[in-house]
Amino acid sequence: MKFDWTQGFVPPPETSAAIRVIRPLLIILMSFAHFGILDHLSRMNSAATLDFSNWLMVFLKGGLAKSGVPLLSLISGYLAVLSLERYGYLELLVRKARRLVWPLIWANLLFIVLITWPAQAQNPEVRPDLQIHPFSALGWFQATFAFYRIPANEPLYFLKDLFTCFLLLPLLAAVARVKYLNVAVIIWMAWKCIYLESAFFFEIYPLWFMRFDIVFAFYVGILLYHWKRGLVINSTPVNAGLVSLFLFSSGTAAVVYVLLAQPEHRELFLWLDFVVKLCSVLGCVALMSLLVRHPGRISGLLDWLSPFAYTLFLTHLFIFTFFTRAWTGLFGAPEFFGVSGVLYIVMMLVSAVLAAIVLKSAWTAMVARVRAGA
């Protein structure tokens, strides 16, 4: 018996436009987590002096950098139900395997060959959690498929977790239709997010998540679609308030992260982390609502960059790594609060964006030429 997933809901055009505009900005925010110059963990793991330098470092990597994954996961869950209605489960999985699993494989293997292998050959302390050099089949498998390890190309754990969400899509979509149970599941998932539980049901790959907040946000997206809600907030004052709430919560949490030592206040840090991620979703939804309802140069630029966002996600760690090596070789280590630090961050980001544009454009042109020749 075939389950009828059709709900008769079509997201408003504004929602699609807002998603398109916010996507590249979320990817850029995610890339903040891979700024090697920002050592926020040393500040969080031991009570540090509260000065602007320490606060800003933690604010960028402990706050803003975490805002990309939750909303991208929510958007994926929201659109997943529409795709399930259109294609059915098996065809959707094939499509998502091409979109998520195939890039997970090639981008990690390329990263291993170009970066991790030679780096470990020179220094075994580089990614000691992965046995790449000397060759280990298990180590390469873990580094490629995010098998109970952060993969070689670190941000690509998101692809593995997102594909797991699609594996669970029929279950999540069915539960979302059951009144009261759907809300109870939200509470259960939130609890697992706060206390960093990794398994959906069992500690078995691939149902083991690197970040459980990914499936939590994915499920919230499914619920919003089931409740026939758009993702654009119409009230400008509400949007401004939510953006302010996100910045305030991230800034306040950064103060606590700097002043207190995480090992001694682990539970407080876990709850603060969840609150920051929750506020980040609200703030980023509000921000994309403002961008799409009040179009200008920034929203126009983001809209133009949107087709290159996925390529930026896949390749930015390559560019960051090579750029950092070139910079330190030429100029030495950049100083975070000096001119060198500002130039380093800005130029590295611009280089990553330009590389994504060039690579995506070249690939599109090559595919078009091959198809024309066929």
Task: Annotate the PLM regions.
Residues 12-16, 85-94, 171-181, 226-239, ...:
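Membrane-interface helix-boundary motifs at transmembrane edges
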Residues 14-50, 64, 68-79, 98-119, ...:
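Kinked, hydrophobic transmembrane alpha-helices enriched for aromatic residues
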Residues 1-10, 291-306, 317-374:
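C-terminal "closing" transmembrane helix and its immediate cytosolic amphipathic cap
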Residues 17, 56-69, 146-161, 197-219, ...:
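Interfacial loop-to-helix transition and helix-capping segments at the boundaries
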Residues 45-58, 131-135, 139:
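Perimembrane loop-to-helix junctions flanking transmembrane segments
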